[in-house]
Amino acid sequence: MQFKLLSAIGIIIIVSGHCYHGGMELAYNWFPPYSYNLALFVFISGYFYKTDYEENIGKYIWKRTKRLLIPAYLWNIFYGGMVAFLGLFGFTIGAKPDLYNLFVMPFVDGEAFQYNLGSWFVYPLFLVCIINVLFRKFLKLIHLDNEFIVLIVYLAIGMIGINTAIENPTAINGIVKLFVRTMFFLPCYEFGRFYKAVLEKKDTLNNVAYFAIIFAVQLILLTFCEELEYTPSSFTNFNNGFVIPYISSITAIAFWLRVSRLLVPAIGNSKFVRLIADNTYGIMVNQLVGFMCLKFVFYGLSCITSGSLFGDFNVASFKSSIWYYYLPNGLQQWAFVYLIFGLFVPILISIILNKICNIVHPSSYLKKT
């Protein structure tokens, strides 16, 4: 249950990062979300890696393709159609739904149609899964299958990726962006596997000492480093070199690991937590549509009441920018409502699709996404 809760916390942090932190504070002053949010997500994926996958690599690759790639491409096609449809009503959000943006752009960028821009992470994560299982199979064949070796190699690759972005910022586009994203994710994935295989059984330090160490390290980072946050989607703003991003990821992951462990007894086998944790894929892909649904509510009420309600709603911005957020009276607290929509509209979509797919085909690709 600890990792269910950690998954729920992780996706809440990611979604809130797209809507003014969701109008709430989750230790963001200490752990800036864009210094670790995707790293935490990939860490969780790595934690659930099993060495059994190496026995039948073809089956594993096909399983990852069904679980990650095929749904992402289907969603991309859907949102391409949505861009074309909304374009009939004056919406200019998203790129032209041509063959390139439908089938190539998802892999090299993932943000063409905007409404599903959160899905960009699927493609480098897929490559990480494939590279990881192949590399581990190779190490096993030469009798060097050791978690320390994997960790060192992946860290070297990740740091090379970050350094490439630092030294050649204008070159980070197209297929290069896919490569450096994948390189960056590799150590984060191994952090999860390394924790499960090596560290978890040794994770017994008392809470006072544990948190004292984490906050001491984090305070040093905040004091002596520039802005800790970077932008993983565009792979930019690595202002502190190629080592600090991984250190800040480790401290934040360690913090939330222990917090989730401490909260489990109070939460128990919460259906609410499981609902969020079991739908992280759908939330990641469809969160922006959740935000748009709330904006449509504001827009509709403004039209129905002839501006008596929400009269300052900016229709032009609503139709032209996915990042326009209407906050009544400028209240940041409304960001919490955006967070709720960003979480539960995608969950509702996933539930409906799963019910439909279970009727049509019980082994649907979208099951449990």
Model-assigned labels for residue ranges:
Residues 1-369:
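Alpha-helical transmembrane segments and their immediate juxtamembrane cytosolic regions
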